[in-house]
Amino acid sequence: MKLKSLLVSLGLLAGAAAVQAEEPLKVGFIYVGPVGDLGWSYEHDMGRKGLEEYFGDKIKTTFVENVPEGADAERVITQLAKAGNDLIFTTSFGFMNPTVKVAKRFPNVKFEHATGYKLDKNLGTYVLRTYEGRYISGVAAGMMTKTNTIGYIGSFPIPEVIRDINAAYMGAKSVNPDVKMKIVWANTWYDPGKETDAANALMDQGVDVMLQHTDSPAPLIAAEKRGLRAIGQASDQSKFAPNAHIFSVRDNWTPYYIKEVQAVMDGTWKSQDFWGGFHDDMLTLASINPNLPTEVRAKIDATHDAIKSGAFKPFTGPIKDNKGNIAVPADHSLTDVELAQVNWYVEGITDEIPR
């Protein structure tokens, strides 16, 4: 009788284990903006949808949008962990410290933070080499400007944004030694009203080609209304400004998300600092305007191909900062660690970094 009961119990346990093994992997996402921002958060959510399409019923995804950076983020990340998510992606720089705190409290959950630099056993980081796209954007802007004044809408003065401002200006200077750059800080990732105000402030100063590090298409729309030019951010924003739009630098998160989810399923996931870019198609140039001058299109393509192949790295010295100091020595290319710590403007930018 005891043996029979034991066998029944073992059978039940085996059945339960089989059911448990078939349960989908739970993956959570937290976004700083709305999924409809048609920029940064939108493309992360496209990556989430790409996961669902690839894995089908093997996974179950959850997302929370419009989460402010700070205490609210810690609360939402905690809720995602308590809800049984096996892997959580936190997709904004300001989610870094909240993610670190929650990861320590949930050692059996795996976390990945976008654009950050703090690692732990169960916490990895991932970032795009957006500076590659900014350099090409600068090349296009430097060739297209008629006023020799291009503009950049910054979000927050963090290394990623400062690095990209530098890359854009270096790209512009490589084709136009006389070009100047104006910078306006919106102090937001996503706020169409503030982004429009920033765009108009730049154009009022003589800027005729704009770049942005904010997430809505508002700057492009503003440029379209005034007959000027702009470059899209994070997603294909061409439909909002068919005449103003030069091209968009599109983020493609799907390959990375698939790779990391598969690693969790295979038991091979590990904490790492991952950088993706043109070389692995995590960055692409979207909807290049067909009406660009032939020489501009040729230079865009050539610069893209050189960066994608690794033949050219934008942050290769000698590079001086705007104080006259050597920021990057001759024949040295900034390492990923160094790229993550850029806190200086390149020579020629006359603005000061807000502190």
Give the positions of each predicted feature.
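Gram-negative bacterial Sec-dependent N-terminal signal peptides
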Residues: 1-21
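A residue-level marker of the well-folded mature domains of exported/periplasmic proteins
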Residues: 22-355
